[in-house]
């Protein structure tokens, strides 16, 4: 009987200890396990880091709202897409920091967020959308990449891609450290794009956009269209 009572008391202390840890985390960093997802959509002005974990580990999210209780931070997985959102508040002195631990990704969408990938983002096929002054820094190992970038956003890319389809309107794509075998690029509205292309390049610029590329592709098509623009090969 005494053993039963002692066990019950220990369980109560264990439960209250867990509640305290959860409550303490509520004012700072939170850690939540997630169901499996294949895509991420971030629509918030926050800083997010992506870390790949083995398939044997469950994905999770760690976030810190820096003590703000008005952000209404939300992260949920629906239809195999992790959706992250947060209520904007210009009075906040600090941005929310997020770390996403994932197994594999086929699509990434960023709106307003500053995103970095730890290690190499590896995928056979990858779709990336960056808009509303978002930023992306990543090292890639991708066979087929489709990327759309608008809204004065920026991207710094390295690594290797076999096939690239890129649309950029405003903003900047710095990819001179990304080795691309074949690229099709459409740059508009004063966008700036720098690339490294080895075999095939199809490029088009309009409304004062600029594309510069290094490498010696044997197949080159395209040119400047409406309201000019520039396409230049650099050493």
Residue map of PLM features:
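Intrinsically disordered, low-complexity terminal regions
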Residues: 1-235
